[in-house]
Amino acid sequence: MAFKFNAEVRTAQGKGASRRLRHNGQIPAIVYGGSEEPVSIILNHDELNNAQAHESFYSEVITLVIGGKEVAVKVQAMQRHPFKPKLVHIDFKRA
């Protein structure tokens, strides 16, 4: 199963900005690795939450569309809420 998500570049940093994103149904994330600089991004929570239920989400290469540019990544780390079925933050590593 191929996964493809649309992402926006994240400009506001910090705890307050991250909380506002989560309250609006979005997840803060970061893409790093390779020769390019790390990029902070915003993803839709519901799309990611549904996709992460599939086992292949953790092993396959995922395509992120960031500002019209496709980036191939793999999930490096994922933080979940302690008792709610929600994602808090996700790290992607360029494939």
From Swiss-Prot:
Q: Which family does it belong to?
A: Belongs to the bacterial ribosomal protein bL25 family.
Q: Which HAMAP family match?
A: Ribosomal_bL25
One matching Pfam family is: Ribosomal_L25p
Its domain of life reads Bacteria
Keywords per UniProt: Ribonucleoprotein, Ribosomal protein, RNA-binding, rRNA-binding
Give a Gene Ontology cellular component term annotated to this protein: cytosolic large ribosomal subunit
Function recorded in the entry: This is one of the proteins that binds to the 5S RNA in the ribosome where it forms part of the central protuberance.
Q: Which InterPro entries is this protein grouped with? A: Rbsml_bL25/Gln-tRNA_synth_N, Ribosomal_bL25/Gln-tRNA_synth, Ribosomal_bL25_short, Ribosomal_L25_dom, Ribosomal_uL5_bac-type
| MF terms (GO), sorted A to Z | 5S rRNA binding; structural constituent of ribosome
What does the record note on quaternary structure? Part of the 50S ribosomal subunit; part of the 5S rRNA/L5/L18/L25 subcomplex. Contacts the 5S rRNA. Binds to the 5S rRNA independently of L5 and L18.
On whether Plastid is a keyword of this UniProt record, the answer is: no
**CDD domains for this protein:** Ribosomal_L25_TL5_CTC
Q: What is this protein called?
A: Large ribosomal subunit protein bL25
For this entry, list what GO says about its biological process. translation
